Amino acid sequence: MLMRGWERGQGYEHGHGHEHGHGHEHGGFWERRPFSEVHHELTVAYATHKIRRVLDDGHEQVDEVRLRSYNGKLVGPTIEVCPGDTLKILLRNQLPFKEELVGDHPHVGPHGANVTNLHFHGMHVSPAGNSDNVLLSIGPNQDLEYEVKIPTDHPAGTHWYHAHKHGAVSIQLGSGMAGPLIVRGDIDQIEGIREARERIIVLQQIPYRLVTDPYDNTRQANMVEEFPQLFEVTWQRELVPQGRRVTLNGEVLPTFRLRPGEVERWRFIHAGVHFPFRLRLVREGGNPATESIPYYLIAMDGITTGRLDQVDVTEMHPGYREDVLVHAVGRDGRPLARGTYLLVDEVEQNPGARVLARVVVDGPPKMMRLPRPEALAALAPFKPIRDEELTSTTPQEARFEVQVVKPPPAPEFRFLINGKEFNPHDPSRQLTLGAVEEWVVSSVGAAEFFPGHPFHIHTNPFQLTDAQGRVIWKDTIYVPVGQQVRLRTRYRRYIGQFMLHCHIVTHEDEGMMQLLEIVPPRQDAGGPPGGGSGSHH
């Protein structure tokens, strides 16, 4: 792996790879030569890993698993770039050629599990050619060099890359084929963040099939090969009771260490395949309702909010990223008492599986300051979209729908957008470059099985209004069944085809995806550019 174009800034330190108990860390900030080429190589192949299981009685067991992986690791390498850089990634597919694992039919459901590609999730870059083009297919023993030109005005933030070959997304992402993609920039250099140590925390659900019967040769032991094991119900009813746990940078129950009074920047990336997380920091043995440790939300989906919002809990659905500042002080402003604290997931119903990490506060005090809110306010990258900026009075519609084809006890479903399953041969929904539009996104059907769907759209972020009436920018938003969300977005800079889909990726592989295309304005069109077609056609 070669990364060019970076120089160390003062006080820089970095925890390479995924060292036990540390994750990805750095202190200080990057200085760079502008407009550099950043080179990486990703080799996709089966690799053997060790993953701990934690049983309800406290006993632990280490499973040896065999998974499709990047560069032989459970989490892909961290890639760091600056605005104006060109990212070049040589993707080598060294998965074995098997006829049943390379086919492209049917168009929905699992297929082509050994064919791959890359998506640069959250990046505002071209979706065409060998850039962020998820229509590419790289088969076994094939290589492709991606070339991603990052615009000079790209906001600094937390993004990620992952496999996105339709029909194979869930099996490959469920195997851990994902890694952090960090855009460095202005926010990294402000006082209160520049001095903070950083942890990149990749949260994953690896639903490998556990086979304990040595005479059972009907299934692939300790691998992710079977589509049903990727669904939410399998994780909840079968895998968690076996001791399966969420991994953080490939580890189960890592330990993080802070000094009293210290500030750290944690970059959370939900790279899992199904359940959301509700993350809270609490003192070990304490009451979460009264003894949680607040932290400060500064970015969502890689986009600086421009605020320093104190929160007790953060809710993350698949595809989400959240940057928080953890300040090791109590609610009274004094250094946090030495001891052990826990990062817990309140979504998890099994009490033994709620703890995701231990946070040990120890050592001499290191009193650090948080950034000033006005310094963050100056870094919010986008202006709100007001009514007068809209170029169409008719919103675009995206309706996630699950139809129950066969009822329990062996239910079957269809996963649709606007009444249709994804078909790559259908015409794309046409959108016009330069248009500014509103979207109405809703979820309907089968709420007892699937309570909602995270809407994700490639290439351009969108704005929405949160429960407090504030404008926020994201690229992924959860839409509960029976509700709708109104979004606004600008189709800036890039033409080409890209996707919107549910980021519970089993739903995506089953057809809950739609092809979009941004096209140049018609030459005979007068006035401001118009909108899109309003429907898949």
Where are these regions (language model features)?
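Histidine-centered divalent metal-coordination motifs
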Residues: 119-121, 162-167, 453-460, 501-507
